Swiss-Prot record:
Protein name: tRNA uridine(34) hydroxylase
Function: Catalyzes oxygen-dependent 5-hydroxyuridine (ho5U) modification at position 34 in tRNAs.
Species of the source: Prochlorococcus marinus subsp. pastoris (strain CCMP1986 / NIES-2087 / MED4)
Pfam families linked to this entry: Rhodanese (PF00581), UPF0176_N (PF17773)
Domain of life assignment: Bacteria
Keyword vocabulary terms for this entry: Oxidoreductase, tRNA processing
């Protein structure tokens, strides 16, 4: 399918996912993969499903029918993009306790969460002086692009977000209950779960960007957009520009940080071995392993074989 275009669908839904339905969906998807060029990553839990699938148009439509039959009347949030290359090596399906790990079992986003704000209303909301804007993503995602004047909790992973809320959010709210709290993330799932957490803690006037940054970039013209930079994604594309095309960043295969073209010109950068983010992070033995891995990758590249870091 090298001459075809891959359709990429990122999706999630919070709903009560029964165990028999989880097993059935997993079996059906792997059955489709056997005979088709399907790749992706899906995370399934009792609270719903979350992930991205990549295939040709017809296969994607069949997968969406399967998922919609299970989700039922619950809202299935979908973002679509396209690529000339596969963005995953294969199909992976993981069954976990949460579809996005926060570590607060007492919240239930399918029953109680904040108010959706569409892309066109979002600009007005975040321009309001009575609104604080919180980026619920990890620090390395925020580092390559975010909305103007948004708060960066500087978390390593989403499970650190509840602690940040307890320690810091009150400083921005003060005693003013009229403050709006507007939250966003890549595709909508983390900020939706974050609003459920805040409601559980008694906060009011809580909003989240429907469909996340990806939907916003799809809806808004570059001239109207308040998003600056590129949007980090968890696949081989690394980042997307405002046209939802592959951006200018790559990944340091030593530490996993996104690195720009300028970063690669840094004297500390060695492809596959280190970047300026991790130059003091690993041991000499680690670097020897990374160097050997990179040599093998380069050899295979020379033979015109595609090699992906899993």
């Amino acid at each position: 399918m090298s001459n075809n275009i891959y359709k990429i669908v990122s999706l999630y839904s919070f709903f009560s996912f029964q165990e028999n339905s989880i097993i059935e969906l997993k079996e059906n998807l792997f059955s489709i993969e056997k005979n088709n060029d399907l790749s992706g990553l899906l995370i399934i839990a009792r609270e719903g499903l979350n992930g991205t699938v990549c295939a040709e148009e017809g296969i994607i439509e069949n997968i969406l029918k399967l998922i919609k039959n299970i989700v039922g009347n619950n809202k299935l949030n979908i973002k679509v993009s396209y690529s000339k290359k596969k963005i995953f090596k294969k199909l992976k399906i993981k069954i976990k306790d949460e579809i996005v790990t926060m570590g607060v079992p007492e919240i239930n986003p399918s029953e109680d969460s904040g108010t959706y704000i569409d892309s066109f209303s979002w600009n007005k909301l975040i321009k309001d002086k009575n609104t604080i804007v919180v980026d619920t993503r990890n620090h390395y995602e925020v580092s390559i692009g975010s909305f103007k004047k948004s708060i960066n909790p500087n978390t390593e992973n989403f499970s650190e977000f509840p602690e940040w809320v307890d320690d810091n959010l009150g400083k921005y709210i003060g005693d003013d209950d009229s403050k709006n709290i507007a939250m966003f993330c890549t595709g909508g799932i983390r900020c939706e779960k974050a609003t459920s957490l805040l409601k559980k803690k008694g906060y009011k006037n809580i909003f989240h960007l429907q469909g996340g940054i990806l939907k916003y970039l799809e809806d808004m013209s570059k001239e109207e957009s308040l998003f600056e930079g590129e949007c980090f994604v968890f696949d081989k594309r690394v980042a997307l520009d405002h046209e939802l095309k592959q951006g200018s960043y790559s990944i340091c295969h030593a530490c996993g940080m996104p690195i720009s073209i300028e970063d690669q010109k840094n004297k500390e950068y060695r492809e596959g071995i280190q970047c300026h983010f991790c130059v003091n992070k690993f041991s000499d033995n680690d670097r020897k392993r990374f160097e050997e891995r990179q040599k093998q990758i380069n050899k295979l590249k020379d033979k015109n074989q595609k090699v992906y870091k899993d």
